[in-house]
């Protein structure tokens, strides 16, 4: 459906139901979702969403993912307070990935770092190049 409509003019619309019906969810019913800070373009994290998480996110404006480890919906910030407020949700041209533009409160990463991409690779090494902005023990009480 997405490829079929890629030559449509700007302003062309389909229903949310049709778009969700045609997303390329994987065998587990999930689609990759990249969270990006809406005003700076900073890439914060990658997580997974199922249809229910997408629908809840769009309905509430608070970003909800699907936790593979817990096997349930994960409302970002429900235990840490580090909430993501939805600014815009975009679907890529193949319908197999989402870009979730957010306003991130505090850190996005469970390590207490602003984002999850703190390992920087070059031809010889991989180096941690970002410090936590908050102690994870303070975020999660562990």
Swiss-Prot record:
The gene is hisI. InterPro entries: PRA-CH, PRib_AMP_CycHydrolase_dom, PRib_AMP_CycHydrolase_sf. It catalyses: 1-(5-phospho-beta-D-ribosyl)-5'-AMP + H2O = 1-(5-phospho-beta-D-ribosyl)-5-[(5-phospho-beta-D-ribosylamino)methylideneamino]imidazole-4-carboxamide. Zn(2+) binds at residues 93, 109, 116. It comes from Alcanivorax borkumensis (strain ATCC 700651 / DSM 11573 / NCIMB 13689 / SK2). Binds 1 Mg(2+) ion per subunit. SUPFAM superfamilies: HisI-like (SSF141734). Disulfide bonds: none annotated. GO terms for cellular component: cytoplasm. GO terms for biological process: L-histidine biosynthetic process. This is Phosphoribosyl-AMP cyclohydrolase. Keywords: Amino-acid biosynthesis, Cytoplasm, Histidine biosynthesis, Hydrolase, Magnesium, Metal-binding, Zinc. GO terms for molecular function: magnesium ion binding; phosphoribosyl-AMP cyclohydrolase activity; zinc ion binding.
